[in-house]
């Protein structure tokens, strides 16, 4: 297929930011990026500060906070609905798991919405996505192993909703891509002891699962990678294509490629993102979110683990304006 050209932008950073880390999470409220959790060394948590990056001034700060914050953790996920951030899961170095917390960006208050004892089994390296009412949680690693369950937290009714199980065809997995597109939840790839290359889709209206076969420039199996939606398209970047023999303690084979999937035609296309010297380091285990930078919507990525097992501290942006869309 004919590759589409686009380029990465390295975003300048000022102020006291999160620094080098991996297994953390990011989300956006307005022109502010919020970052939480992570590890600098494998399986050792860092802090529970909530870092804020202003996309206009390009400066980091630490959010003022009251209330009951999540404890320091890694393998955590977060999404935004309205002006509220929802943070779920993640574990510390003693394998304690966080429940579901919210952070109100207008009042700067943390709240514990659902402790682990009253909600889902504690987990890390799960994936989250959201719409205007629900926070969706799929998969992850619990104390009993990797799971393939799908739940949602209804922010209006303030309760968990359990959906039908994904079935044996969709193995329990950690760190898949999870994206909501036009009333359907897409589960892409992940890790079950091996990197997975399958895709599954859940229709929210019919509550039916189905396995999805795709064509085109199909990406290699992978996990711990950014995945976001853009209209009817899913965009993925990077990830770990092969695990290290030491698993989490080492860095496996990392990717630096960008792909787009048309969810109607089910055709993948690999995107050429400038010259090799213009690309950011290959990585996985990074924080990511959709964001608008200088009027353009795109993928914003912070940190992650590099092929040398060194944690990264850069902030890079990839705009959607040159995607091959129709």
Curated annotation (Swiss-Prot):
Catalytic activities: a (Z)-N-(sulfonatooxy)alkanimidothioate = a nitrile + sulfur + sulfate; (Z)-phenyl-N-(sulfonatooxy)methanimidothioate = phenylacetonitrile + sulfur + sulfate; (Z)-N-(sulfonatooxy)prop-2-enimidothioate = but-3-enenitrile + sulfur + sulfate; (Z)-(indol-3-yl)-N-(sulfonatooxy)methanimidothioate = (indol-3-yl)acetonitrile + sulfur + sulfate
Positions bound to Fe(2+): 240, 248
Regulation: The presence of Fe(2+) supports lyase activity in a dose-dependent manner with both benzylglucosinolate and 2-propenylglucosinolate as substrates. More active at pH 7.4 than at pH 6.
Knockout mutant characteristics: No visible phenotype.
Molecular-function GO terms, alphabetical: lyase activity; metal ion binding
GO CC annotation, single: plastid
GO BP annotations listed: glucosinolate catabolic process; nitrile biosynthetic process
Keyword Protein biosynthesis: no
Gene3D superfamilies, sorted: Kelch-type beta propeller
Keyword Transmembrane applies: no
Entry keywords, A to Z: Iron, Kelch repeat, Lyase, Metal-binding, Repeat
Catalytic center residues: 91 (proton donor), 146 (proton donor)
Protein's recorded name: Thiohydroximate-O-sulfate sulfur/sulfate-lyase (nitrile-forming) NSP5
Primary gene name: NSP5
